[in-house]
Amino acid sequence: MKTYSAKPAEISKKWILIDATNLVLGRLAAKVAVVLRGKDKPTYTPHMDCGNNVIIINAEHVKLTGDKSNAKSGKFYYRHSGFPGGIKVTTAGKILQSNYPERIIQLAVKRMLPSNKLGRKQFSNLYVYKGQTHPHAAQTPVLYDFAGKNSKNIRNQNIV
C-alpha cells in the first residue's frame, strides 16, 4: 500500500461556521487550527492546503479560564514598534473590551499554525467577526456545534 498524497484537483474545501458564545478561547483555537490545516480529514497531506474555511461569529463573547483577563496577573500580549523602548503591552481583557475583540481569536489561532508560507495561506482561510452577522451566506456554511462536543469547551457566566 502506498502513502496517499492529495493532488490539487482532489482537494475540496467546505465552509464551517462556529458560534464563539461562551466558548473557551484555547480549546476553540486548537480545534480551529486543526480544521484549517486539514488534519481532521483522512486525505490530509502535509505540504498542501487541504483544510476547510472557518467562520467564527460572536468573537466578543469568547471566554478565558482562570485569571487571564485580569490586568495585573493575567495574559499579556506584547508588540514592539521597532524603536528603542518601544515595547507595548496589553492584556487579554483589554483586547476583548476594545473595538476589535476578534483579534484575540486571530492571535490564538495564528500562533497554533506553522510559521511558514503554508501556515500563512491556511490562516487566510479564517474569518472572525464581532457580532452575529457575516458576509459569507452565499457559501452556505455548515454550523459546527463545538460546545456540544465536550463540557469543558463551554464556560458559563456564573462559573468562576
Curated annotation (Swiss-Prot):
Gene3D superfamilies: Ribosomal protein L13. One of its GO terms (molecular function) is mRNA binding. The keyword Ribonucleoprotein applies. Keywords: Ribonucleoprotein, Ribosomal protein. One of its GO terms (cellular component) is cytosolic large ribosomal subunit. GO terms for biological process: negative regulation of translation; translation. PROSITE patterns: RIBOSOMAL_L13. NCBIfam families: rplM_bact. PANTHER family: LARGE RIBOSOMAL SUBUNIT PROTEIN UL13M (PTHR11545:SF2), RIBOSOMAL PROTEIN L13 (PTHR11545). This protein is one of the early assembly proteins of the 50S ribosomal subunit, although it is not seen to bind rRNA by itself. It is important during the early stages of 50S assembly. Part of the 50S ribosomal subunit. Belongs to the universal ribosomal protein uL13 family. This is Large ribosomal subunit protein uL13.
